[in-house]
């Protein structure tokens, strides 16, 4: 299980909070003392909260959920991108665009535009543009890449969010809360720990501290993802076994139906025809039966996609 230790946190400077005059009183339960005008965070409480948050992230991944990392301050950009790449999840490190999740359809159109320009570049279509048109597209491409690179493959809402610097990312947190998306965050002494589901008391300014918790979340997600892969394999194996059993049962029943009520090797007496053979089939139907007009009632089964064919007709 992914966890952090007291030594790792001390080495990363997790215990250093903000100046005492810049604190949020709601962080009082997590403050150990104050020294030199700076609050010192109680790491015994931090380790408990951090490991609890890691368990939650693992559970999200174990159920097939996705995660988004959010950290747009200078110190957070590199650690966030590395952690997101490590576990293959989404990230935002430029600026959180208002409505990035609550108005995702609009953001999705920008993502589609980014993909379209990508395709144009791959096909060499830029070579047929004028210098001015090419420069305009390049500028648009760079702007879209800056803002959307970390979510370009996002097709639906993530199951959880990890945030660095709660006061700075308050818009992202508010959108997640509105959509019912749980939030895990590093909560420095100037933060409101009650604004998120899993607050990890700690320094959100030091790069080493940010990297420590970002990697903790990434490692926890990877552990859960392995469990999810195992569940998928088990489900696939069960479906395969069921299909094999059904196929085997079909082979056993077929000879019984053919030989029922007749001796081995005996010839069947020719049946008298009561009328011309009837075969019903349409463009959207399988050929399901053939017989005589008086003896056979045909029930056609629609192919998969029945509704599409009928509406087209």
Curated annotation (Swiss-Prot):
Query: Highest taxon of the source?
Result: Bacteria
Record-linked InterPro entries: Ribosomal_uS2, Ribosomal_uS2_bac/mit/plastid, Ribosomal_uS2_CS, Ribosomal_uS2_flav_dom_sf
One example of the protein's molecular function in GO is: structural constituent of ribosome
UniProt KW Membrane keyword: no
Q: Name one Pfam family in it.
A: Ribosomal_S2
| Gene name as annotated | rpsB
Question: Among the entry's GO cellular component annotations, what is one?
Answer: cytosolic small ribosomal subunit
List the GO biological process terms: translation
Q: Where is the composition biased (Basic and acidic residues)?
A: 233-256
UniProt cross-references to Gene3D superfamilies, sorted A to Z: Glucose-6-phosphate isomerase like protein, domain 1, Helix hairpin bin
List every stretch annotated Disordered: 233-293
Family (UniProt): Belongs to the universal ribosomal protein uS2 family.
Keywords on record: Ribonucleoprotein, Ribosomal protein
Q: What is this protein called?
A: Small ribosomal subunit protein uS2
């Amino acid at each position: 299980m992914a966890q952090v230790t007291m030594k790792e946190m001390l080495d990363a400077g997790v215990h250093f909070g903000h100046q005492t005059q810049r604190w949020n009183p709601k962080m009082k339960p997590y403050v150990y003392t104050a020294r030199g005008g700076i609050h010192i965070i109680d790491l015994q409480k931090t380790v408990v909260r951090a490991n609890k948050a890691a368990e939650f992230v693992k559970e999200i991944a174990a159920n097939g959920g996705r995660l988004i990392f959010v950290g747009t301050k200078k110190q957070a950009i590199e650690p966030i991108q590395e952690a997101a790449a490590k576990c293959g999840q989404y990230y935002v490190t430029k600026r959180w665009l208002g409505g990035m999740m609550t108005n995702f359809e609009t953001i999705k159109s920008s993502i589609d535009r980014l993909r379209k320009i990508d395709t144009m570049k791959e096909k060499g279509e830029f070579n047929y543009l004028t210098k001015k048109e090419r420069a305009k597209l390049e500028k648009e491409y760079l702007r879209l890449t800056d803002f959307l690179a970390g979510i370009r493959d996002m097709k639906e809402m993530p199951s959880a969010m990890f945030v660095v610097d709660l006061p700075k990312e308050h818009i992202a947190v508010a959108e997640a809360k509105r959509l019912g998306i749980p939030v895990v965050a590093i909560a420095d002494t100037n933060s409101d720990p009650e604004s998120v589901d899993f607050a990890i008391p700690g320094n959100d300014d030091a790069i080493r501290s940010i990297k420590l918790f970002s990697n903790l979340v990434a490692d926890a997600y990877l552990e859960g993802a392995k469990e999810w892969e195992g569940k998928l394999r088990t489900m696939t194996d069960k479906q395969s076994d069921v299909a094999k059993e059904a196929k085997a049962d079909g082979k056993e029943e077929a000879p019984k139906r053919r030989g029922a009520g007749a001796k081995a090797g005996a010839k069947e007496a020719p049946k008298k025809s009561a009328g011309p053979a009837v075969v019903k089939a349409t463009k959207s139907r399988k050929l399901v039966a053939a017989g005589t007009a008086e003896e056979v009632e045909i029930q056609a089964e629609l192919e998969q996609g029945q509704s599409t064919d009928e509406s087209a007709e």
